[in-house]
Amino acid sequence: WLLIQLVGDGTRKMAEFRPGDIVNIMLPLGNSFTIPSKEQENKRLLLIGGGVGTAPMLYLGACLKEAGFEPTFLLGARSKDDVLQLDEFQRFGKVYITTEDGSLGEKGYVTNHTILKEVRFDQIYTCGPKPMMVAVAKYAGAEAISCEVSLENTMACGIGACLCCVEKKKEGHNVCVC
């Protein structure tokens, strides 16, 4: 899959790609999520994605399914028109949706979805807008659930030299998202 949100010249050019085009890409960038070991196959895994942050959840879900897990997805979007590749997500696990306008799934935000009250998850993975991930991390902390966060940010050079993707960690030092 190649899911793109048009935000600048680079992504506009990427949107013009056609099947069979040859492209030169520097991947992967960033760090990967942790895939649990086979001994943990009964772990209840929740993948929470919001906006453009749903794209990495699709790939992670495919990897988890291939490793023998049954992930649960909780996807947030502004409206039903912003929910992408729903059929693909459903291939890899159960899918719950929230939309801000209520046009698909529950109305509201992922952190208010009823599934969080009904099921006790062992591990949460999340990617999306920073306020959403902060809320997810707070929920996970309050429930003593392990949570891995994948930051989304603008990336220009992909190697950290331009410092456009810098984020401050709670410990005080900076890290590059790329």
What is each residue range found by the language model?
Residues 23-26:
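Generic structural signal for buried aliphatic residues
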Residues 56-65:
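Histidine-anchored nucleotide/phosphate-binding helix
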